[in-house]
Amino acid sequence: MAKFRRRTCILLSLFILFIFSLMMGLKMLWPNAASFGPPFGLDLLPELHPLNAHSGNKADFQRSDRINMETNTKALKGAGMTVLPAKASEVNLEELPPLNYFLHAFYYSWYGNPQFDGKYIHWNHPVLEHWDPRIAKNYPQGQHSPPDDIGSSFYPELGSYSSRDPSVIETHMKQMRSASIGVLALSWYPPDSRDDNGEATDHLVPTILDKAHKYNLKVTFHIEPYSNRDDQNMHQNIKYIIDKYGNHPAFYRYKTRTGHSLPMFYVYDSYITKPTIWANLLTPSGSQSVRSSPYDGLFIALLVEEKHKNDILQSGFDGIYTYFATNGFTYGSSHQNWNNLKSFCEKNNLMFIPSVGPGYIDTSIRPWNTQNTRNRVNGKYYEVGLSAALQTHPSLISITSFNEWHEGTQIEKAVPKRTANTIYLDYRPHKPSLYLELTRKWSEKFSKERMTYALDQQQPAS
């Protein structure tokens, strides 16, 4: 009997040793960070839902997305409150990727909700009618009704948020920092102006500048086509921006090859103003000229049609950008024309700034515009555009957009959401951070390649 007990103890000990060895072996084979755990330091961002490391199979993605969707939906019930991110710890910038100040992203601060603004703004965007009544009658009309029905084909991870919410602004800055975006190009209207579906937003600029500075981001201005925009009020508005915000450490200035540090202004829909009017502002002899004054800058025109090239030269602009995320929509947004545009810019001493987007879909507000939809193809469309931009050796690259949700060009985090009437698009089978991660990847590639051909490698002036 004693001999049997001894044998049993030996066998049991060997079995325990085998199990222990097996567990240790598996532990060594399993990576410290699973394939789909938070990469690139994104675990530093305030997350709405904790992300557990898992094997990354399709079932895991679907299960995780269901949890995200359910949590998001619950948080949005009752007055559509902004989904507040978890309180962040002190920012450790050393753990975040380096910034690329030659990569800009168009940023919109026009969103609002009842919690912060007393009503929904922009999320309840009206459905726009086609200009031809014969076509318009075939499509729905009316207005979106947040929080479950918003004017977008995607749904934000932060819900129908307010651009006034400081925690939302901070989360946006963290996301851009995680993507190695160095500069946000802020959509801007003068203090007494607004877009057709929004409210005045200039009062938000100080908070945006402060939050950007916390992450070493810079802010430049994307001047919208406000009512009656001309040389005189543009001069006044440029003076206003520089006088009010120009001394902030987050205010962006570009160091030119001649050593000057100048503010930069993207001018949206510049082509609707006659070249002779722009020349009054942008040429040295103009009646409203800012040249060689404290209000001089780099003024970047939107090139839509090929014929705009000569208008831009006559106007006195310093460069061009293409804005639209739909390849083939305009001459300027068509990748196949970018090499020619770059040659034109080099010949005429202009900056060339191609604009790249992750996709395009605006059918939530323009249901008749399906011909301009561009599928994201799980990030491939975005990467093709970024590759085409890099091949031109551009001065800068602009991203359309960080958060233009109406046109489906956002790289901001989006989550799955389903309602009784709508199934929103999302980034599956990838994570909500897919386009931030792709942006970081190409930002690093652009930074390295730019060093091989550009002379202006300085950091932006503070």
UniProtKB/Swiss-Prot annotation:
Region feature Catalytic, mapped onto this chain: 60-462
Protein name: Glycoprotein endo-alpha-1,2-mannosidase
Pfam families in the record: Glyco_hydro_99
UniProt KW keywords: Golgi apparatus, Hydrolase, Membrane, Signal-anchor, Transmembrane, Transmembrane helix
The enzyme's E.C. designation: 3.2.1.130
Family, per entry: Belongs to the glycosyl hydrolase 99 family.
GO MF terms held by the record: glycoprotein endo-alpha-1,2-mannosidase activity
Residue ranges, Cytoplasmic side: 1-9
Post-translational modification: Undergoes proteolytic cleavage in the C-terminal region.
GO cellular component: Golgi membrane
The UniProt record lists the keyword Cytoplasm: no
Top-rank taxon: Eukaryota
EC class name: hydrolase
